[in-house]
């Protein structure tokens, strides 16, 4: 029964969070479906390919992203997670690229963005399908050119970041509905990992 699996699963996740551990949930270490996921992680972890993780809410997509990071050559560098659902199109440029002092009203000091914080490591875009189209265009340009410009600055900055994204929706359908850019999906989806729902575990 699903209920029989959920209680020990929740207890395990809470215990691991309290211990400050970044491990895969216990349920992810058993069963053929997750052995296949682990195999795909091993295939791609040591590369710099972008990875798209597909799965419903609560299936451990961020755990998989952490595991990819821990098994990669970037493991000693930062892992920066971004909740894409909380970023408005107005806040996104400063959040991703940072800003200089005086760039806008209230910018009393310079701020580093996610790309700077993740330099040399991994940037995890959680629920990337929630990004506004304007933000998608901004990210696409940065990824294509491997450069960005902090808000209010006069010079571009290069970056060395591996991008992992996750989504709980069908992004191909979102492309058809013109809610997600096809070219950005292409850039983010060099390699895909699909996480089965808990009911199938």
Identify the role of each PLM range:
Residues 69, 179-181:
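Short, solvent-exposed amphipathic alpha-helical segments in soluble enzyme
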Residues 1-22:
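N-terminal accessory segments that target, anchor, or regulate ATP-driven/P-loop NTPase machines
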Residues 16-19, 142, 148, 187-191:
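Coiled-coil segment of the histidine kinase dimerization/signal-transmission module
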Residues 21-158, 163-169, 174, 197-200:
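AAA+ ATPase active-site-proximal loops
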Residues 1-7, 93, 137, 181, ...:
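Conserved two-component signaling phosphotransfer/partner-docking surface
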